[in-house]
Every structure is written in C-alpha cells, then in structure tokens.
C-alpha cells in the first residue's frame, strides 16, 4: 500500500519535471532530484535509519556520498513548496474517492501555523564557536483537516524571519470558498486583507494588541456553545473594511488561563457566531499533526546543519505524513462497517507496519513485478482491497484518558535538579504498602 501511494504522490518523472520547472540555480547531471526525494522519503518513513544507510542500500546510485550531501544542502526552498503542494494535488482525487467528512459543508478549510525546526548539531565550521543553539529555519504550513493532508508549505531559511510575512505567499493561492484559520500571531491587517482580497474567508483569534478599530457596533447575544456563551459585533478597521468580532466567554479557563476569547472573521451571516466559535477549536488539529510528525516520522534530522538540508528533511516528513494519512483513511474506510462508530486507525501503528513489511516486499516483489495504478479510482479500489487484509486490532488507535490537572508551584533550583533512584523509591513504596 505504501509503495502504491508513494508512487502516486511522488512519481519519479513528475518529481524531475517539478525540478526542471521550479529550479533557479540547481541542475541535474548524474543525480536526479527524484532520487534525492526517494532517499529522504525512506528516511522520513523510518524505512532507513539514516540518509547514509539509505544511499548505501540504493542500487544504481551513480554518485558519491559527498555529492549526494552537497546536492541536499543546496536544495532550493521553492522546490520544496512545489513538491508538497503538487504531491497533495495528486493525492486529493484518491482521498475524495475514498470518501471523507466535512467540518463545514460547502467550504474548504485551511489551518495555518508555523513550525520552527529544533537546533541542529554544530557540524558546520561557522557554527562551532557559537555557544547558542543553531536554528536552521522554519516552515509555515497550510493543513486541510477534512482531507488530513498538508496542502501547502512555505519554507524559510532564516529562523528569525517573521511568520506574518512568510504566510503571505500561501495566502496568494487562496480562493473563494476557502476558510483560513490561524492563531492570534496572524491577526494583522496585511494578513487579513491579503486573505480577503483573494475572495477567501478567515477566522483569526484576536491578540491583546490588535489592529486599531475605527468603529464598533453594539454587542448582540448569540446563544451558547458547549464551552461557554457567545456574542458578536461588527467592527471597522482603519482601511474601512467591516468584519465580525465574536466573543466566547468560557465556563472554565483554558490552559493559558484565559476566560474570554475573541475571534475576527469575514464569514457571511449564514455562518452563525456559535459556528465560528466552534470552528476555531478545530485549529488545534494542526498541533496534533505536528505532534505526529515529530513522534512518528523523522521530521527533525538534527545532523543536517545546513538550513536547506534541514528544510528538505522536514518537507520529506510532511510528504511521508500525507502518504500515511491516505493509508489511514483507506484502512478506516475498509473496516468502517465492521468496527464501532468512531473507530480510528493509528498513524503510529501504521508506520510500524510499514517499517516491518516494506523491506520484505522489496525483496519478494521487485518493482518490475509490481504494477501501479494509473487512475485515482483504480488506486482507491486497490487500496481498499489491500486494507481489508489488515487486522483492525493491530492498527487501532488507543485513546488516552483526560490528563489530571496539577497545580503548578514554585520550586527551588536545588529541588528541581535533585534526582532519585527509581528502584529504591519503588522498593520503599512496596514496603510501605505491605506494612
């Protein structure tokens, strides 16, 4: 299944065409860009422990490891965006054939957030004398929660660049019928106006220092939702644009201690204030996606000190996530009638299956004996047929119970740095229990 979806998402000929269409200074001689993407995808999926190991296992690699690393550290960010957005477009027809639900029928949802890459090892000569952490950059990601796919990505090499500026290229591709949601960092006039100018709608949380308001209407009560009460008003900003502001008064404070939240939106009146307040809660789904990227896939390769190489590693992990997401949907649809309502497959357990079975498949069934599907309909039907062979229990998601809130207290540095022997603590606890 993984091989089928990978070929659909990043067919070698298509990847090389993307390289030719979007490259600026790079060129292909003996090492094709499709080969680089294939190697990085194997590492991101965990099918190879490292790029070095993946390169040594690849038959027919005609360049040295030094040439491979040199190619990777020169990968242009424009190529990464074209790769992610293009591969998502290739997967969307298959996802739609498999079937999916809609959070807000009639609208395409886009959740935007930034992901800063962690500090890398200081292997580069220029970094060795630096005491502080070396940050290789970040990416602003557009995520579709209905499809569970990352549909666009804007990589940025400068870790200190503004996310508010970096999101503008993503908004340039927005269109009517789309609803973009973002946190309070993006509540600025340039961002909101850029979104509205494309015909798209937005829901953005209001920060403490928001754009200046020229006029505010009276508040109108709008009823209640599960988490609290809602009211709204019309606001006008300095550019003369009039938007809706929705206030949500929470029954209990959230994790940040907030009891009141405000949202700005330009959605039409057909979407109620209660819906706007409820829709914003969906924004947290992108946090879950980032968490799965970090825990299931190799999205943070700290040995890649070069910003371009680190961003390629993250983009490869995003690509791998989209592949696993299609596999997850295939398994859920294949077993939907036999499993209880709300049953979900786990991306983590699917990744474990992929890692354990992929190598054996490569040996038992070489590529020349593995026919690939040419249409999304054919691919969806074949994925469902293969998914029915998977035991649902082996890939079922294990939901965790709610965490018990613990009060945060001030702690002395000496106590924070203290340590104990786990074996001795357990032994003492057992003795106390028996006493």
Predicted regions and their residues:
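Extracellular beta-strand-rich solenoid/capping regions of secreted or surface-exposed proteins
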Residues: 129-130
């Amino acid at each position: 299944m993984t091989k089928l979806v990978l070929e659909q998402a990043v067919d070698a000929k298509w990847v090389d065409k993307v390289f030719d269409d979007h490259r600026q200074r790079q060129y292909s001689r003996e090492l094709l860009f499709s080969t680089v993407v294939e190697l990085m995808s194997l590492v991101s999926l965990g099918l190879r422990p490292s790029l070095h190991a993946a390169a040594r296992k690849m038959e027919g690699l005609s360049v040295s490891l030094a040439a491979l690393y040199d190619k990777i550290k020169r990968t242009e960010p424009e190529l990464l965006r074209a790769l992610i957005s293009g591969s998502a477009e290739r997967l969307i027809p298959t996802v739609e054939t498999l079937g999916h639900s809609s959070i807000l029928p009639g609208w395409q949802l886009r959740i935007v957030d930034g992901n800063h890459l962690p500090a890398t090892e200081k292997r580069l000569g220029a970094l060795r004398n630096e005491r502080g952490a070396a940050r290789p950059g970040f990416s602003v990601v557009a995520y579709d929660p209905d499809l569970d796919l990352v549909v666009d990505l804007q990589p940025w090499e400068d870790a200190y660049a503004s996310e508010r500026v970096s999101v503008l290229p993503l908004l340039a591709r927005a269109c009517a019928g789309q609803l973009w949601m973002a946190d309070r960092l993006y509540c600025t006039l340039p961002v909101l106006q850029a979104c509205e100018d494309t015909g798209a709608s937005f829901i953005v949380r209001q920060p403490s220092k928001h754009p200046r308001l020229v006029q505010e209407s009276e508040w109108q009560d709008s009823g209640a939702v599960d988490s609290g009460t809602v009211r709204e008003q019309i606001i006008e900003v300095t550019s003369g644009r009039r938007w809706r502001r929705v206030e949500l008064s929470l029954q209990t404070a959230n994790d940040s201690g907030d009891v009141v939240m405000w949202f700005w939106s330009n959605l039409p009146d057909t979407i109620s204030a209660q819906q706007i307040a409820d829709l914003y809660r969906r924004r947290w789904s992108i946090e879950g996606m980032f968490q799965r990227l970090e825990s299931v896939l190799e999205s943070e390769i700290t040995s890649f000190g070069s910003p371009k190489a680190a961003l390629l590693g993250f983009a490869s992990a995003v690509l791998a996530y989209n592949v696993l997401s299609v596999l997850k949907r295939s398994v859920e649809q294949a077993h939907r009638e036999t499993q209880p309502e709300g049953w979900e497959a786990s991306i983590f357990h699917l990744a474990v299956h992929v890692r354990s079975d992929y190598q054996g498949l490569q040996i038992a069934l070489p590529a020349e004996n593995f026919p690939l599907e040419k249409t999304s309909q054919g691919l969806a039907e074949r994925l469902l047929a293969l998914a029915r062979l998977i035991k649902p229990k082996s890939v079922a998601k294990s939901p965790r119970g709610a965490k018990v809130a613990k009060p945060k207290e001030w702690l002395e540095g000496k106590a924070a740095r203290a340590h104990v022997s786990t074996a001795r603590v357990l032994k003492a606890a057992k003795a106390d229990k028996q006493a």
